[in-house]
Amino acid sequence: MTASFALVLLLGGVAVCIATGVFGGYSEKANHQANPEYLNLAHYATSTWSAQQPGKTHFDTVVEVLKVETQTVAGTNYRLTLKVAESTCELTSTYNKDTCLPKADVAQRTCTTVVCESLRGDKFVSSFECAAA
């Protein structure tokens, strides 16, 4: 009887975790605009991605962070939905979020990126995709 009760509790806990997105899935961060870490990750992803694009002459920069979702694995995956635009900074310069501002009258794109951060703090951009302007 005790083993059956323990099994019911275990299965109930797993069901709650799955239903709330805690167990392996992404969970949306409601207060993402109040957390500067997410904006820093967005700038990291955008500048890293744009620097790797062939034929590109200027960094892209973040206009707005629209949505943040996190997934805990062996570290944390951050799935960020962003508005980006080409910046005034050439790729031959060093990217700085405070000085690399969006060019005037350029199209903004909505992009989704995933930044993976290990338990040691190492991070990399695992994907970066944009919809047409």
UniProtKB/Swiss-Prot annotation:
Induction: Blood feeding does not affect expression levels. Keywords: Protease inhibitor, Secreted, Signal, Thiol protease inhibitor. It is found in: Secreted. CDD domains: CY. The keyword Secreted applies. Residues 29-115 form the Cystatin domain. The keyword Secreted applies. Salivary gland. One of its GO terms (cellular component) is extracellular space. Residues 1-19 form the signal peptide. GO terms for molecular function: cysteine-type endopeptidase inhibitor activity. It comes from the Eukaryota. Belongs to the cystatin family. Inhibitor of cysteine proteinases. Inhibits host cathepsin L (CTSL) and S (CTSS). Modulates production of various cytokines and chemokines in lipopolysaccharide (LPS)-stimulated mouse dendritic cell. Suppresses maturation of mouse bone-marrow-derived dendritic cells (BMDCs). This is Salivary cystatin-L. It comes from Ixodes persulcatus.
